[in-house]
Amino acid sequence: MSNPIVTSLKILASNTAADKGLEVVELKFNPHSKPITIQVQIQKKPKKDVSLDDCAQFSELISETIELSKLINEPYLLEISSPGLGDLLQTDKDFKTFKGFPIEVLFKNNENTKLTKSGLLHERSKEYLLINIKGRISKIPREDVITVQLTSPTG
């Protein structure tokens, strides 16, 4: 038997996506995580990749739709992605779009040892990558950064 909240969320997401020329590829609902997690994968019709802007715009629309529906009466985490959207952040636009998102940074230190740090993307300037690690801003020189990858806060 299907969960009625999941069924309603799928209908809301599909209708919201269709209005923007998108379709929902997959919707996952995890009521056991704190906060509740809703993961939605979208793509353009017919089966074309979406841009980061498409994901951001859909996130705003579906968030508002869920709030108005009153289906979920407690805090929740909404994750929007695409089956074809890469996890690596590379362009200035990527870094602006995903400000505040969880990331993992692979970088080298002064001894050329590879290290990783995880936190929330704060900013990428001309000189540094700034990440928020438990409320503290950590600066990593941009020339030391090897990769910056989006991660899921749900593991």
Swiss-Prot record:
GO biological process, one term: translation
Highest taxon above the source species: Bacteria
Localisation: Cytoplasm
Keywords of the record: Cytoplasm, Ribosome biogenesis
Gene3D superfamilies: RimP-like superfamily, N-terminal
UniProt-listed InterPro entries: Ribosome_maturation_RimP, RimP_C_sf, RimP_N, RimP_N_sf
Cellular-component GO terms for this entry: cytosol
Described function: Required for maturation of 30S ribosomal subunits.
Family per record: Belongs to the RimP family.
Name of protein: Ribosome maturation factor RimP
Gene name of the record: rimP
